[in-house]
Amino acid sequence: GTEAFSKMQPGDKIEALGPLGNGFSETGKKPMVIGGGIGIPPMLGLAKSLKESGSDVTAVLGYRSELFLQDEFASSSSVYNATEDGNSGTKGTVIDAIKENNLDADIIFACGPKPMLRAIKELAAQKKIPCYISLEERMACGIGACLACVCKSREKDAHSNVNNKRICKDGPVFLSTEVEI
């Protein structure tokens, strides 16, 4: 996937299937968008759309060290950073940044590594805030037939009658209470 794309030249042709699944809804008067690592870029379009719809957007971004997309997020959001090494913003995680800055929201949207998503899911449950998370898995078929991208769910699905959700078809965005991560 990504490696093949990186070797492409202008004019090269590809076949692609997509987009797959669903995306984030653009709701909330005071939404918080949270991105960690490679989960940061997917949140930029959402932050811009939310701002355009009149929302007061807060972005909490988690990095190892080097910051990116700061100006782009700043044009649509109040931006708070967390870095593992303390290079900028809060030293620690996005959860640390949320607590340190006493941030609140009426809805949370998040994309990033699973440990971060687990912590955000827990925080949202404690604060009783709806939370939508974007999960990532390799998607072999992209249409939900192969079940390679399933995650555990609270309810049985109609497709296989087990507690699974297909990330490519039922997601990748889920209400955090629907899935186990």
Stretch-by-stretch model annotation:
Residues 1-31:
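FAD-binding FR-type
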Residues 10, 25, 29, 45, ...:
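Short capping/connector residues at structural and topological boundaries
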Residues 60-181:
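Reductase modules of NAD(P)H-dependent flavoproteins
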Residues 22-79:
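Hydrophobic, well-structured mid-protein blocks that either form specific transmembrane helices
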Residues 3-7, 30-31, 51-52, 80-83, ...:
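N-terminal start-of-chain detector that recognizes signal peptides
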